[in-house]
Amino acid sequence: MSAVLDTPVAVRRTAMDLLARREHGRVELTRKLRQRGAPDELIEPALDRLAEEGLLSEARYLESFIRYRSNAGYGPARIREELGQRGLDRGDIDQSLRESEVDWAARLEEVWQRKFAGQRPQDPRSRAQQTRFLAYRGFSMEMIGRLLSGRDLYD
């Protein structure tokens, strides 16, 4: 049976339980608390206090999400879109992607090697297939073109 979220203490405890599992953005945490029946007038003060105490951090959430999704084989465009759908500021997303220490070229090559076993496309159809897959994963057409044509990704 779920707890009734009708007091500031109950809302804070539930928010902290969610944050203990993994980082959350403010919008995502608000949505989850609403789904659990917490009223808006209790959610905002609780989240403000958690942010003041450093327990709720958009920067940490962005960093964690970028690391998690890039390790899963996704590129910057896909990650940017997913974070935008989660209600985060585009400027903050772009800054976090720039500051992340992800080597996108190496990540692209890993994903390509894993999916296509390092086999460069021999015909237009297989090139289109590989391009579609890598673009869907969120890598830029420029990087994909360099990889598939055998050019250096770091130029």
Curated annotation (Swiss-Prot):
Residue spans crossing the bilayer: none
GO cellular component terms attached to this protein's record: cytoplasm
GO biological process, one term: regulation of DNA repair
Subcellular location: Cytoplasm
UniProt entry tagged with the keyword Cytoplasm: yes
Keywords, comma-separated and alphabetical: Cytoplasm
Keyword set includes Cytoplasm: yes
InterPro entries linked to this entry: RecX_HTH_1st (IPR053926), RecX_HTH_2nd (IPR053924), RecX_HTH_3rd (IPR053925), Regulatory_RecX (IPR003783), WH-like_DNA-bd_sf (IPR036388)
Pfam families registered for this protein in UniProt: RecX_HTH1, RecX_HTH2, RecX_HTH3
Protein family according to the UniProt entry: Belongs to the RecX family.
Function: Modulates RecA activity.
PANTHER family, A to Z: REGULATORY PROTEIN RECX FAMILY PROTEIN (PTHR33602:SF1)
Name of this chain's protein: Regulatory protein RecX
Organism this protein belongs to: Pseudomonas entomophila (strain L48)
